C-alpha cells in the first residue's frame, strides 16, 4: 500500500538556455526542430559546430540601399560592424528592413516609420537573433528600430552616422534643407534662374541624412 503522506520527488527542471538562438540550434528538449533548423541554416554556409558553439548570433538591421540614399553609407559601415562582431566572438547575420526615403515619398513619414518598426519586430521575434546592431539615421529610422528592439526585448546597439553636413555654394554656407526655402524665394523674386536654383539646392545635400 502506498504511503499517502510520502512526497513525490519533483521532476528536474530543464536548464535555462544561455542564448536565445539555442532554442533554434541547440535545444535538447526539442531535438527534431533543432535538427530541422540546423539543416536549413547550414544553407547560409554556417557549420554544425559553429551554430552549436555557444557564440551569440548578432543581427545587423540594414537600412541602406540604392532606394534610400539617406542611409546608403550603412552598406559600407555594416562591413566594419560585421568584422567587429566576428572579432568579439559573435556570428553576424545582416538583413534588410523596410526602406525610408522621405524626400521621394511624401507625406508618408509616419507610415514608413511604422512599417519599418513592424517589419523589424517580425524579424527579431521570428529568427534566431541574440542581439542586434541597428543602423539608424533620421528621426524615422531611429525611433522605429529602437521601438522594435524594445518590443522584442533583446540587446541592441544603435549605430547612427550623424546628420548631413552643411554644404557650400560660391564660397557661402548652404544649410542642410533650409536653403531650399530660401532658394525658392530667390527664384520667385527673379534673383536666380531655374538652373541656378537646382545647383544651389543640390549644394546643400553633400552626404548623409537630412536634418529637416
Regions inferred by a protein language model and the residue ranges of each:
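N-terminal amphipathic/basic leader segments beginning at the initiator methionine
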Residues: 2-55
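Gly-rich Lys/Arg/Thr-decorated short loops/hinges at beta-loop-alpha junctions or inter-strand turns
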Residues: 17-28, 58-65, 95-107, 124, ...
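Anionic-ligand anchoring segments at beta-strand to alpha-helix junctions in alpha/beta enzyme folds, i.e.
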Residues: 27-31, 73-113
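Glycine-rich anion/phosphate-binding loops
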Residues: 35-41, 69-80
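Short, contiguous clusters of charged residues that form electrostatic/catalytic patches at enzyme active sites
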Residues: 40, 44, 79, 114-118, ...
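N-terminal glycine-rich anion-binding loops that anchor highly charged ligand groups
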Residues: 49-59, 87-96
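Gly/Ser/Thr-rich loops at beta-strand to alpha-helix junctions
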Residues: 63-71, 136-142
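Active-site cavity-forming subdomains of large catalytic enzyme subunits
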Residues: 110-212
